[in-house]
């Protein structure tokens, strides 16, 4: 998950090759859950010329999209432009094609003039751990400003309800409750998908708002272990940061009990992490 507000986020992303590898594996799992389709917006690929990926991280989503789109010539005969935007450059690739560009931008900050009305497609993914209540309205407005008329937003997101709340493990549910209470105390947005739909439907420059929900279990067992690993990492990392920040005596022992217990539950009971991933769409008028 990318972090747009690290001072309030449930967890942060560390620099380094190990973290890049984790983010790239997470990408593979998340795309698998949404039926291995990168592009869900109903848009003619030949009309997609300029693309922005907000919270881009390592840029792997842009790499994958380019592999999908580039065999298809653009309608105007120009090469595509791929822009990765993130509030931190820590994971930007050191080497990339000439038509790829990476820049620092926080989606909750005013849109630079040079980016307004520029893109045919703007993609966002996994900001659930970083947005306070009301932030989704700001993000949606800024995303709309990035688009040209007729362009699309595609936002792939988790929700606080199904993130870890349906997993049949007492230890996972304890961690889920701890994280939810922390987010509520900090005034963070627990249901980003619902907030997106509400904000996009109310936005005067957006239309054709939609939401599709994909389930981890229904995605099939091929990546079961990887799905479990990605979601368990998210759950345990969030828990660890909250416990460490609390200063509570015995926090380290409590984290060990919860994390090791959750892993044992999953292995012993053959659990397949039951959660939803939402694909949210909106088109600029």
Curated annotation (Swiss-Prot):
EC number(s) stated in the UniProt entry for this protein: 2.1.1.-
One Pfam family recorded for the sequence: Methyltransf_12
Keywords, comma-separated and alphabetical: Methyltransferase, S-adenosyl-L-methionine, Transferase
Uppermost EC category: transferase
Pathway(s) of this molecule: Secondary metabolite biosynthesis
GO BP annotations, alphabetical order: methylation
InterPro entries per UniProt: Methyltransf_12, SAM-dependent_MTases_sf
GO molecular function terms listed in the Swiss-Prot or TrEMBL record: methyltransferase activity
UniProt-listed SUPFAM superfamilies: S-adenosyl-L-methionine-dependent methyltransferases (SSF53335)
CDD domains for the chain: AdoMet_MTases (cd02440)
Domain of life of the organism encoding this protein: Eukaryota
Keyword Nucleotide-binding: no
Keyword Ribosomal protein: no
Transmembrane spans: none
Family, similarity comment: Belongs to the methyltransferase superfamily. LaeA methyltransferase family.
Record function comment: Methyltransferase; part of the gene cluster that mediates the biosynthesis of gregatin A, a fungal polyketide featuring an alkylated furanone core. The PKS grgA synthesizes C11 and C4 polyketide chains in the presence and absence of the trans-enoyl reductase grgB, respectively. The polyketide transferase grgF is then responsible for the fusion of the two carbon chains to produce the furanone skeleton of gregatin A. Next, the cytochrome P450 monooxygenase grgG accepts performs the oxidative cyclization to furnish the gregatin scaffold and leads to the formation of desmethylgregatin A.
Name this protein carries in UniProt: Methyltransferase grgD
Lineage, highest ranks first: Eukaryota, Fungi, Dikarya, Ascomycota, Pezizomycotina
């Amino acid at each position: 998950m990318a972090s747009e507000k690290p001072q309030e986020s449930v967890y942060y992303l560390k620099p380094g090759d190990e973290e890049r590898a984790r983010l790239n594996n997470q990408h593979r799992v998340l795309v698998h859950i949404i039926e291995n389709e990168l592009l869900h917006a109903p848009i003619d690929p030949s009309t997609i010329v300029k693309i922005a990926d907000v919270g881009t991280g390592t840029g792997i989503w842009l790499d994958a999209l380019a592999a999908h789109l580039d065999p298809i010539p653009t309608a105007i005969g120009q090469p595509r432009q791929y822009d990765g935007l993130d509030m931190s450059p820590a994971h930007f690739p050191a080497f990339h094609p000439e038509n790829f560009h990476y820049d620092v931008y926080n989606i909750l900050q005013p849109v630079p003039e040079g980016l307004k009305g520029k893109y045919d497609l703007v993609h966002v993914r996994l900001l659930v751990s970083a947005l306070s209540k009301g932030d989704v309205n700001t993000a949606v407005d800024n995303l709309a400003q990035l688009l040209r008329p007729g362009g699309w937003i595609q936002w792939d997101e988790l929700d606080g309800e199904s993130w870890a709340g349906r997993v049949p493990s007492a230890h996972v549910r304890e961690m889920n409750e701890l994280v939810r209470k922390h987010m509520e105390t900090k005034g963070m947005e627990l249901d980003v998908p619902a907030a997106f739909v509400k904000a996009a439907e109310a936005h005067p420059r957006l239309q054709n708002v939609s939401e599709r929900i994909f389930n981890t279990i229904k995605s099939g067992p091929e990546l079961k272990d990887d799905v479990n690993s990605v979601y368990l990492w998210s759950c345990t990392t969030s828990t660890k940061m909250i416990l460490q920040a609390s200063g509570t005596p015995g926090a380290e022992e409590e984290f060990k009990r919860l994390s090791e217990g959750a892993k044992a539950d999953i292995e012993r009971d053959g659990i397949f992490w039951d959660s939803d991933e939402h694909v949210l769409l909106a088109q600029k008028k």
